[in-house]
Amino acid sequence: MSRIFLKLISIVFLISCSDNEEVQNTEIITDSYFFQKKVFNMNLYNCTTPIENVDSTYKKTSDSLNFYKFSELTEQDNQIASCTQTYTQINELTPLKSGLLLGLSYMELSNCNSKVEEELLLEDLAPYLEYLKENDVQVWTGISNLENNSFLWINIWKSEEYREEFLLEWINSDNSGKFAIALSSSARCQNPSTYLFL
C-alpha cells in the first residue's frame, strides 16, 4: 500500500515539475539587487591648505585641498590639521554602477534635509532610481543615514562632461518636473558641491 502511495506522489511530483512551454511566468522584484547593495564608510576632508602626504588609498583633487575614501572596512580616520573632516556611512542605491567608484571620480555632494521618515524617503526615490537604471545613466548614487533629519546625497558621475550633458537633457524633459515634485515633498537639498578626484 505504501509503495503505491509513493509511486502516486512521485508521479504527481514529476508532472508538476515537467516543462510546460505554454505557461511562462515572469516575476518582477521591485527592489531587485537590494541584497547586493553595500554600505560604505566615507572619510571626506576639505582643507584650507594643500595636503601633499595623503594616504595613497585616498582620492584627491588636483589642488590637494580635498580628498576622500570609501571603504567597507575602514572606520573614521584621524583628524588632519587645517581640514574639516566629514565621516558618515553611505548607503549604495545604484549597485550596478559601482564600477564608477574606480578611477577618476566626478563627485557631486549635497547636504539635504528630509521631511519624512527614511523608509518614505527611499520610497519617493524609487521612481528616480528606476529611471537611472532603465536608461543606463552613468551615475553611482548613495545617501547617508538620516541624522536629525539631515543626510548627504552623493552622485559619482562618469565625467563632468557626461553630467553636464545629462542635466541639460534632464532639465528639458518631462521627467525632471515629475521627479522634482515627488522629491520636494520628501526632502530639500542645497546646491551640490562638485569635485574631480584623481
What do the PLM-derived regions correspond to, one by one?
Residues 174-180:
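Outer-membrane beta-barrel domain signature
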Residues 15-16:
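C-terminal motif of bacterial Sec signal peptides marking the signal peptidase cleavage site
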Residues 2-11:
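Sec-dependent signal peptide recognition
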